Amino acid sequence: MSSSDRPVRAARTKRSLYMEWAKTHSHAKYNLATSGLTGVSREEFPLDVRELEITAPGGYGHAPLLARLAVHTGVSEESIVTAAGTSMANHLAMAALLEPGDEIVLEQPAYGPLLDVANYLGARVKRLPRRFETRFSVSLEELQRAITTSTRLVVLSNLHNPTGALLSAQMVGAIGKLAIRARARVLIDEVYLEMLFGKPAPFCFPIGQSVAGAKENPFVVTSSLTKVYGLSGLRCGWILAAPALARRMWLLNDLFAATGALPAERLSVMALDHLEKFRDRARTLLAANRALLDSFLDSRRDIECFRPPAGTMVFPRLPHGRDPEAFFRLLREKFETTVVPGSFFEMPRHFRIGIGGDTPTLRAGLERLSAALDALTKR
């Protein structure tokens, strides 16, 4: 094994530089940094105050919410664990699966907090490259080489954050079979996957049940109502896992959250009862915004960009010889616009554009992004 193939156990980190940046530096008049759908207003939400409660008997999960999520995911309640958004779901899932020193294989580029949590938990991290030249796909051959008898967990996202690349059902099934042979698990963050809307979506948990047969499902899934539906404030996240593992996660969560916030859980039940309304809202908004994005990308010959089949984000690449940090500074200070610097995804020449905001803001933001690129070219 070469030195570059050896898993790395990084210094234990107790912060997320990306989340710190997002909370303190991403805000601008024209914010193209946010990857989720613009938030649902109080007027748009089907609020029934008669259904709200402040307190309820404790237990492992709010029964009405678990019932709704079982219908939504097509998974039995014994395999569902609720969490405060996908971020906490990822943390809880990884904490339940890993011990300090365990080997994991994690995609690269990756959403920063996934790597941060792995390092915080003391994992030895090997990287699985997802390359621009191959449309950020996963190479099954490279994954097979990366997995060893010591590998405890593989961590992926689908749709991929930051690129929006889609893992097909065939690829998900092949990854599941590989994990079963290696006696490893696969954590897939699917928080963006429901943006496929009417298209068949390769949700990995049922695929895992199919390929596992009598064996335990190798997949652990995390998701929430945040990104697709504009319901971030509810913090309605969940984990799908084999029943025994789900039970372990509930017990571990006693150390983290103990019980859920009942008013938010009741609001989440209301949201799930009217989810088609929020899905239609998202579909309509993204159809208009995708057209704006395509027009912008068609007009630029100075950036390269893989265009994913769905979702709210793309990950363009700046030309060689340009100073990315100077460009992001120019964009923010002169043009009042923010994107996410690629350095937060370990690819500093790239940047992430989010298209889930309101259409007028996106249109104006893309115009300013184009002007900033023109200014960069003239330097």
Residue ranges and their predicted role:
Residues 4, 215-287, 294-296, 367, ...:
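Conserved core segment of the aminotransferase class I/II
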Residues 121, 181-182, 215, 300, ...:
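Helix C-cap/helix->beta junction micro-motif
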Residues 145, 329-339, 345-379:
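PLP-dependent enzyme catalytic core of the Aspartate aminotransferase-like
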